[in-house]
From Swiss-Prot:
Annotated SUPFAM superfamilies: (Trans)glycosidases (SSF51445), Beta-D-glucan exohydrolase, C-terminal domain (SSF52279)
GO molecular function: alpha-L-arabinofuranosidase activity; xylan 1,4-beta-xylosidase activity
Protein name, as recorded: Probable exo-1,4-beta-xylosidase bxlB
Pathway: Glycan degradation; xylan degradation
Underlying gene: bxlB
Stored SMART domains: Fn3_like
Length: 771
């Protein structure tokens, strides 16, 4: 097994090469029992976090301080402070990265590989997300305790999936801000083991702050891209997941992004990092720190031309609130910047105290016997329970897009398994992956399911060669049923690689069409994070069933065949809109606006209504009937709603109401059901009105045939409110309709009225007039 899997900060590879040897050396815990460090207050566990960290920083020389502002911090040998690599990754499992060292074999040569976040998002299962994060943090802590990773991990990616062309959309849970916000809340809870714990298991890092969702599109690259975003869209769409992460889940780290926001590079933007993040969201507790994305501080000078020298770039980022450089600008140029009087010693100390306060909270300087997480080890990695959870997560996320009752497959027999994913392994992991103990391929799973399998790749992901068609068609003719497995992969979508088309690549649709003409039942399994236009498959009556499986990782093949054979009933929902292929010709990727314009059609399900398949779509092997016990709700009054809200939580998180629906399984198959609750209005607040807005969801588990289940969906005041042009969150009086989207065009509704006056729930900080 490879020493370290590929990691995907593609443009940072040259940066790594330029750093001193030892970037992949094992981390070690400091010795606080003897030696020079033991004489410092940082080793005194009776003191508060800040005092301990400050004592360490006070003991450093200026040069030592500057040297330790980079991600691959060399430590201070003179003080007995070991080197520490801050850059460890764990997007969907401990992942290959400069701070993580996998062994060649044996212990610590692999970790559990969960589905990519885009497939986890399709589960709409908050409890599952926390369970996955808990396992990831346990395994991350095991690697950290063994000196094979840091104790902080640069995950999750919570930029909403705005544009289907984005190469990193696979790393996110979807396009809806509420959904992404709930995802990150439960994920951070699981990773850090609590909401703002005094002693986190690991430190999570929410990225990329903010308005980052472009890699390289038609020559426009992330390192110099200026995202022009209205204050309304910033507050309503781009920032809510970060508010949930920082203010509500109380994450300990945030990463600022490559792009500029309205002319100011994110890592140099005090409006973002100080005014919004640290002040408005009150993200100011000890041990909260900000890292740049890798090379982003260099981009301030080289990409954005925001400063005239790299020393100015270093000082500008430090003054704005960036504490750590994933790069070399800080250690190379902060000395020069100090000589030029561009920042104060107190500002440098502030950054280092934040960083080392984080390590103090993690127990890095404490005796191992006093730290509950230091006992976590190799036996806690990839346990049978973790493998079962990976299987469950993949199965819960898979979405059934089409089915003419061909699925579930009725019997064994001969099965033709065709396509570039038919025997895929690492391909099913997506990016930011680590070595897995095993990866269950579709070919393996089909054999395990008892089928006589005729396998042929047929074609590749993106080729016009038809050399494999004959073998594929021959296999299909010999079979009772045909399963085609294809879609897109990291050669099409990845970090540094956006798409220019959202059609199926290469000649895959051509092969599927030829397979459909053979006359055998044909099932298509579509892989990839971003959606492709399935119009031709949906309209072809000879394509009998269609599934979307995202990147299901190590349990992919077995989870998919559990769905195909009916062992598991599909209940996932699309976490994004599937756009027609021509959509890319209607709006440039650089257009950050969500609402329709004079020449643009709008983005996401809230503003675009011509989807091939809408956000939240998903079929089942059974049928459900939805009813409202009460069709007439309320009325509600704005003043009463605000006055009854508890004072110890932000008012936008306060409860509006809990809505009860009856879900009856009217079919013959036990199945989960994801209840998605949308809100509509045509008179509450100013125009334009969104088509609908997700305000709540829940996943009801294992509803049996004939069973009637009462399902409760909680809605917050913030979900009821709308965002004004100046970014304020406003509760408007008016008439509202609630709609349950059940995926089969049945939309039971209930209505209510809100009376009273317009009420501001959150006054959004206004950007500086000089921007």
């Amino acid at each position: 097994m490879a020493h370290i899997t590929s990691w995907h900060y593609g443009n940072a590879i040259a940066l790594l090469v330029s750093l001193a040897p030892g970037a992949l050396s094992l981390n070690t815990f400091p010795d606080c029992s003897s030696g020079p460090l033991s004489k410092l207050a940082v080793c005194d566990t009776s003191l508060d976090v800040t005092t301990r960290a400050q004592s360490l920083v006070n003991a450093m020389t200026f040069e030592e301080k500057v040297n330790n502002t980079q991600y691959n911090s060399p430590g201070v040998p003179r003080l007995g402070l070991p080197a520490y690599n801050w850059w460890s990754e764990a997007l969907h499992g401990v992942a290959g990265s400069p701070g993580v060292e996998f062994a060649d074999s044996g212990p610590f040569s692999y970790a559990t590989s969960f589905p990519q976040p885009i497939l986890l998002g399709a589960t709409f299962d908050d409890d599952l997300i926390k369970q996955v994060a808990t396992v990831v943090s346990t395994e991350g802590r095991a690697f950290g305790n063994a000196g094979r990773s840091g104790l902080d991990f640069w995950t999750p990616n919570i930029n909403p999936f705005r544009d289907a062309r984005w190469g990193r959309g696979q790393e996110t849970p979807g396009e809806d801000p509420l959904h992404v916000s709930r995802y990150v809340y439960h994920l951070v809870d699981g990773l850090q083991n609590g909401i703002g714990p005094a002693n986190p298991k690991v430190v999570a890092t929410c990225k990329h702050f903010a308005a980052y969702d472009l890699e390289d599109w038609n020559g426009v690259v992330r390192h110099s891209f200026n995202a022009e975003v209205s204050t309304q869209d910033l507050s309503e769409f781009y920032l809510p997941p970060f508010k949930s992460c920082a203010r509500d889940a109380r994450v300990d780290a945030v990463m600022c992004s490559y792009n500029a926001l309205n002319g100011v590079p994110a890592c140099a933007d005090s409006y973002l990092l100080q005014t919004i993040l640290r002040e408005h969201w009150k993200w100011d507790e000890p041990g909260r720190w900000i890292t740049s994305d890798c090379g982003a501080i260099d981009d301030i000078y080289n990409g954005h031309n925001f400063t005239t020298t790299p020393a100015e770039a270093a000082a500008t980022a430090l003054n704005a609130g960036t504490d750590l450089d994933c790069g070399t600008v800080f250690p190379k140029y902060l000395g020069q910047a100090a000589d030029e009087g561009l920042y104060s010693n107190q500002t440098l100390d502030r950054a280092l105290v934040r960083l080392y306060s984080s390590l103090v909270k993690l127990g890095y300087f404490d005796p191992a016997e006093d730290q509950p997480y230091r006992s976590i080890g190799w036996t806690d990695v990839d346990t049978p329970a973790a493998e079962a959870l990976a299987h469950k997560a993949a199965g819960e996320g898979i979405v059934l897009l089409k089915n003419d009752k061909t699925l579930p497959l009725k019997a064994k027999g001969t099965l033709a398994l065709i396509g570039p994913y038919a025997n895929a392994t690492k391909q099913m992991q997506g990016n930011y992956e680590g070595p897995a103990k095993y990866i269950r391929t579709l070919l393996w799973a089909a054999t395990q399911a008892g089928y006589d399998v005729k396998y042929a790749a047929g074609t590749a992901i993106n080729t016009n060669s038809t050399a494999g068609f004959d073998a594929a068609l021959s296999a299909a003719k010999q079979a009772d049923v045909v399963v085609y497995a294809g879609g897109i992969d990291n050669t099409i979508e990845a970090e540094g690689r956006d798409r220019t088309t959202i059609a199926w690549p290469g000649n895959q649709v051509n092969l599927i069409d030829q397979l459909s003409k053979i006359g055998k039942p044909l099932v298509v399994v579509q892989f990839g994070g971003g959606q492709v236009d399935d119009s031709s498959l949906l309209s072809n009556p000879r394509v009998n069933a269609l599934l979307w499986a995202g990147y299901p990782s190590q349990e992919g093949g077995s989870a998919i065949f559990d769905i195909l054979t009916g062992k598991t009933a599909p209940a996932g929902r699309l976490p994004v809109t599937q756009y027609p292929a021509d959509y890319v010709n209607q709006v440039p990727m650089t257009d950050m606006a969500l609402r329709p314009g004079s020449n643009t059609p709008g983005r996401t399900y809230r503003w675009y209504d011509k989807a091939v398949l809408p956000f939240g779509f998903g079929l089942h092997y059974t049928t459900f009937k939805i009813s409202w016990p009460r069709r007439a709700l309320g009325p509600y009054n704005t003043a009463a709603l605000v006055s009854r809200s508890p004072k110890n939580v932000p008012i936008d998180r306060a409860a509006f109401d809990t809505f009860h629906i009856q879900v009856t399984n009217t079919g013959k198959t036990t199945s989960d059901y994801v209840a998605l609750l949308f809100l509509k209005t045509t008179d509450a607040g100013p125009k334009p009105y969104p088509l609908k807005t997700l305000v709540g969801y829940t996943r009801a588990k294992q509803i049996k045939p004939g069973e009637k289940r009462s399902v409760d969906i909680e809605v917050s005041l913030g979900s009821l409110a709308r965002t004004a042009e100046n970014g304020d969150l406003v509760l408007y009086p008016g008439r509202y309709t609630l709609e349950v989207d059940v995926g089969e065009s049945q939309y039971p509704t209930a209505s209510f009225t809100v009376t009273g006056k317009e009420t501001i729930l959150d006054s959004f900080p206004q950007p500086p007039k000089t921007r």
